[in-house]
Amino acid sequence: MNRFFLLSLVAGSLAATPAHRAVSTAAAAESEKAPMMVSFAELKWRELPERKGTQFAVLSGDPGVGQYTQMRSVPGGTDNPLHAHSSEITNVVISGVLYMGADAPSAKDFGPGSVVMLPANWVHVSGCRAGSDCVFYQEGKGKFDYKPIAARE
């Protein structure tokens, strides 16, 4: 994928989103003066403990505490059974094919450039189709959580 396209997409998303950084007052004032610019190669990826192979790179805020922006990388062939999140989440697909739906039969595929906005507590399945890993920009309006839901009968 063209890195310029990737960085333009992320930069545009960040420009439209207020930065939520956990920094001191003096540093916060300074951060308002300088843009946040990072290349894809400079991202600091960390493994998501609950989902082996899934990684994230925080851009702003803290997903363990409240509002945040981050990049996510999910291995191709990953399936997440029924679950929900406590806060609203927006995803912008960069590469791969992300799928989501109220259940597996109704799940839709979303390729590069797609925007998927999830309301808080929406019960759904999600994952990354086999063939290539999924990379997407994610913005959460509150703390990130993953609440498994018992399968519907």
Protein language model features and the residues they cover:
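Short acidic-glycine-tyrosine-enriched beta hairpin
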Residues: 62-64, 104-121
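Ligand-binding loop in jelly-roll beta-barrel domains
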Residues: 120-144
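Glycine- and acidic-residue-biased ligand/ion/polar-headgroup-sensing regions
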Residues: 75-77, 85-103
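Bacterial N-terminal signal peptides that target proteins for export
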Residues: 1-8
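Hydrophobic h-region of N-terminal signal peptides that target proteins for export
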Residues: 10-17
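Short beta-strand His + acidic residue motifs that chelate non-heme Fe in jelly-roll/DSBH
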Residues: 80-82, 100-101, 123-130
